């Protein structure tokens, strides 16, 4: 969207609020950044702009989707970067801005390393594609948006991207813009929960939600970048079920754990949900021809791709990453996340972006659809009231999930027969057996009886027994 003056832009924006919000990207506020230079725009193809988007252009692209599909979208921010740029999210849902009980929440995050630019652009293209196809009545996309709350964050590191994009010429330095403006590698900056869970595996301790009730500690930690803190709060505040973090520099779908148990540089380190994570990674790689090609040569001559299988890898088997976002999601919340490396080049020429879109379009859709697998349902008391933070345990898998505020839960699983137990403080636990197909998710609801209700019930039974005995024996 080109700027043509205030009045014309007001018409294009469609509302004063949208116009003011969009113009805010170009203004230097008190202590605010210069957002980045504008460039001549390329024409769209099928409603998608196959080009790099600097910060103002990224905002324009998201606003354009929002205005085009206003009934099923909204834009919000989870915070600001170190230099003050907003960490923007486009949400797509039939009821935007609201968590609908029983509807799972999904997120994509791109551009965590600012110089890894393909993921940033693919997520902008994805937002445009979903909006366009929804309006065309594409049944797959309509069903996806109506039954999933989708959150798309094109750039977690907008400062790093601006630095990388400011380099002259098509050949970009391998490291310029990787870190945030403070020089912090965001994918080494999250609390190292792997080390905690590895200790708990040996000595006993919780296997999930390891940051429960510790938000203040996150805020007070001066070693955490503002981008990291913003995403931690986002993860903790929304009941995400599934996520992918888009990177560049190779071609592979990477799954937990990312950090080795022994501390070695390379070692397969499976998490309790290794089976479903392998399946999730394949759901992405199998639709990407270059990624899943068994004969694809390594991106660089000396690269070690020996851990790659069908375009997937266990993260720690490839190389150990402490403090990564992927494992943080799994160990701090109910969210299962993989990391996808999209391109051998980190900042490839602009004319190649359309090819990357064609390689990844079906994978991006397929991966969102994986959220509708396994088991889902509600945990309530006998009066039908939701029980939040109930624990859902699967026999044989040492990783629990918890119910959200409406009592709703989602548990991703590969096909098979399982024993699922729901429990909550003050309630009697209930176990149920369930046969899980590949998809869709099987609904299993739980009604838990409180200890106080059980005591009253036992008291009434005792009184009835005493009354019967009294009448029988003529007391």
Curated annotation (Swiss-Prot):
Membrane topology designation: Peripheral membrane protein
Residues annotated as domain Peptidase M14: 51-371
Note accompanying the cofactor annotation: Binds 1 zinc ion per subunit.
Sites where the protein binds Zn(2+): 113, 116, 247
Cofactor field: Zn(2+)
UniProt KW keywords: Carboxypeptidase, Cleavage on pair of basic residues, Cytoplasmic vesicle, Glycoprotein, Hydrolase, Membrane, Metal-binding, Metalloprotease, Protease, Secreted, Signal, Zinc, Zymogen
Gene3D superfamilies assigned: Carboxypeptidase-like, regulatory domain (2.60.40.1120), Zn peptidases (3.40.630.10)
PANTHER family linked to this entry: CARBOXYPEPTIDASE E, PROTEASE M14 CARBOXYPEPTIDASE
Record protein name field: Carboxypeptidase E
Top-level taxonomy: Eukaryota, Metazoa, Chordata, Craniata, Vertebrata
Encoding gene, per UniProt annotation: CPE
């Amino acid at each position: 969207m080109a700027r043509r003056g205030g009045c014309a832009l007001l018409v294009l924006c469609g509302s004063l609020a949208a116009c003011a919000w969009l113009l805010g990207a170009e203004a230097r506020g008190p202590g605010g950044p210069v957002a980045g230079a504008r460039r001549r725009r390329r024409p769209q193809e099928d409603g998608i702009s196959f080009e790099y988007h600097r910060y103002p252009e990224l905002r324009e692209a998201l606003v354009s989707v929002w205005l085009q599909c206003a009934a099923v979208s909204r834009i919000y921010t989870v915070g600001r970067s170190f230099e003050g740029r907003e960490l923007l999210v486009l949400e797509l849902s039939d009821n935007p801005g609201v968590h609908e009980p029983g509807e799972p929440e999904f997120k994509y995050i791109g551009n965590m390393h600012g110089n890894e630019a393909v993921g940033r652009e693919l997520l902008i293209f994805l937002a445009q594609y979903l909006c366009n196809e929804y309006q065309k009545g594409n049944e797959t996309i309509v069903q996806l948006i109506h039954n999933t709350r989708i959150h798309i964050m094109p750039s977690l590191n907008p400062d790093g991207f601006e630095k990388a994009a400011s380099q002259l010429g098509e050949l970009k330095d391998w490291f310029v813009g990787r870190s945030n403006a403070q020089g912090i590698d965001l994918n080494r900056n999250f609390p190292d929960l792997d080390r905690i869970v590895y200790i708990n595996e040996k000595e006993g301790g919780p296997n999930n939600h390891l940051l429960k009730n510790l938000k203040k500690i996150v805020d007070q930690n001066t070693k955490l970048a503002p981008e990291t803190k913003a995403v931690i709060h986002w993860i903790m505040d929304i009941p995400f079920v599934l996520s992918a973090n888009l990177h560049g520099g190779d071609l592979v779908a990477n799954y937990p754990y990312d950090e080795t148990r022994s501390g070695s540089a390379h070692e397969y380190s499976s998490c309790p949900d290794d089976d479903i994570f392998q399946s999730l990674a394949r759901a992405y790689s199998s639709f990407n021809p270059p990624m899943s090609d068994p004969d694809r040569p390594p991106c660089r001559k000396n690269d070690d791709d020996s851990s790659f299988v069908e375009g997937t890898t266990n993260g720690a088997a490839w190389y150990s990453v402490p403090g990564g976002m992927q494992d943080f999601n799994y160990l701090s919340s109910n969210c299962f996340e993989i990391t996808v490396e999209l391109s051998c080049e980190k900042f490839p020429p602009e004319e190649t972006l359309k090819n990357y879109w064609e390689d990844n379009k079906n994978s991006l859709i397929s991966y969102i659809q994986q959220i509708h697998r396994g088991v889902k349902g509600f945990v309530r008391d006998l009066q039908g009231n939701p029980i939040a933070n109930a624990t859902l345990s699967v026999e044989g898998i040492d990783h629990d999930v918890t119910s959200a505020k409406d009592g709703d839960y989602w548990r991703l699983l590969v096909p098979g027969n399982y024993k699922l137990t729901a429990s909550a403080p003050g309630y009697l636990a209930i176990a149920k057996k369930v046969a899980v197909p590949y998809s869709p998710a099987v609904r299993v609801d739980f009604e838990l009886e409180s200890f106080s209700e059980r005591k009253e019930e036992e008291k009434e039974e005792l009184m009835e027994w005493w009354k019967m005995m009294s009448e029988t024996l003529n007391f």
